[in-house]
């Protein structure tokens, strides 16, 4: 008996899938280059927590283990005073910036910053146990300090970077949950903002939700969320706006090994141990280690050196859409925490007493960002405009382009007195002002709209660019020299000497 094939038949989609076009296909680069610098950027604060008396921040939290996300605001090239106005036609073309190089300058000396907790949940030293562990008491917390994992990171893109961390997930309705049960975990992807904590060696997780005892990790992260860059998600971005390229260096080793105090939620399986008559209870097996970033050296620095962008990893080859650029920096090799003391009395004491001095902690950071930008033009054909509108409609709106709405066949009602109570409530008018999509996010905004210069030989990064590319800088000073003698003058002098 004949039977039809039981294999599944896959029907192709009704319309072809749109293909992502790289920026090099419709962006034309010019031979005009500009240099921009942020000048010196400084930050000072407490490395562990912000000082907020009466819910007002007096001293911010500034740590060497925070992300520094710089939002660089660039000038509009279409309103820029260009040296050559014939490079593009404003009726059919628009200008954009392309980032072709940058140098992240870091000040301050190399140093290792430590963190800790005065009441850390540490029970036993399980690395070198001398005897059988005794049962934990009601409070076994001790004062412990440590250094963190070492990280150097630089992310560059025209959109904010993404980070990932583990948070508390949602429990299913058909699962009974008791107090003290381990919550489900969920991988959360969010935007990395300025001031977010990096992975310090204890995992990328929301410690406020998953460690409510506030004593399993040091002070600076016990109520915070440590994020790790979501490289997989940013690499899968179809347009490649979030990550042009990145620089990364991480290192860590385990320094000390401890275990936690508290009731063990999941006992060690009986198949894994053999008890004895005298030792019939299995000790606590909730182990953890204190991280360490080891040696910091100037030989392994990623900063204070130029990097040039020839080809980005995604489809966006350095084009700064929206006239903005995001630079995310992490540098834990300059995480020194300075201790400052102040005398409580005006007159200096004759003898030392520790109560007569107040101790404070501060961390300082110093940055200097330099960029090289190339001027580019885009010819506004119908295909290019349709593609840009699909990719990001805000680009065309910034260029004062709009799409006409489809014709409406219905008859609309418009009242004469809109604010009258005699008629039904009218819909509020739509907001005409363009909303910043990143208004609710926190970034370190740096205005570069008045920092562009075409005199490349006047800046360190500009001179490095001229040296590597071989482009000749325009000199505004002419060196005076004697005019060479003409051929007629020299021949007449020879004739006079012959007559003599």
UniProtKB/Swiss-Prot annotation:
GO cellular component, one term: host cell nucleus
Gene Ontology terms: biological process: endocytosis involved in viral entry into host cell; virion attachment to host cell
Record keyword Nucleus present: no
Superkingdom in the source lineage: Viruses
Family (UniProt): Belongs to the papillomaviridae L1 protein family.
Protein location: Virion; Host nucleus
One term of GO molecular function: structural molecule activity
Stated role: Forms an icosahedral capsid with a T=7 symmetry and a 50 nm diameter. The capsid is composed of 72 pentamers linked to each other by disulfide bonds and associated with L2 proteins. Binds to heparan sulfate proteoglycans on cell surface of basal layer keratinocytes to provide initial virion attachment. This binding mediates a conformational change in the virus capsid that facilitates efficient infection. The virion enters the host cell via endocytosis. During virus trafficking, L1 protein dissociates from the viral DNA and the genomic DNA is released to the host nucleus.
Protein name listed in UniProt: Major capsid protein L1
Positions of region (Disordered): 473-500
Keyword DNA damage listed: no
SUPFAM superfamilies assigned: Group I dsDNA viruses
Source organism phylogeny: Viruses, Monodnaviria, Shotokuvirae, Cossaviricota, Papovaviricetes
Keywords: Capsid protein, Disulfide bond, Host nucleus, Host-virus interaction, Late protein, T=7 icosahedral capsid protein, Viral attachment to host cell, Viral penetration into host cytoplasm, Virion, Virus endocytosis by host, Virus entry into host cell
Subunit text: Self-assembles into homopentamers. The capsid has an icosahedral symmetry and consists of 72 capsomers, with each capsomer being a pentamer of L1. Interacts with the minor capsid protein L2; this interaction is necessary for viral genome encapsidation. Interacts with protein E2; this interaction enhances E2-dependent replication and transcription activation.
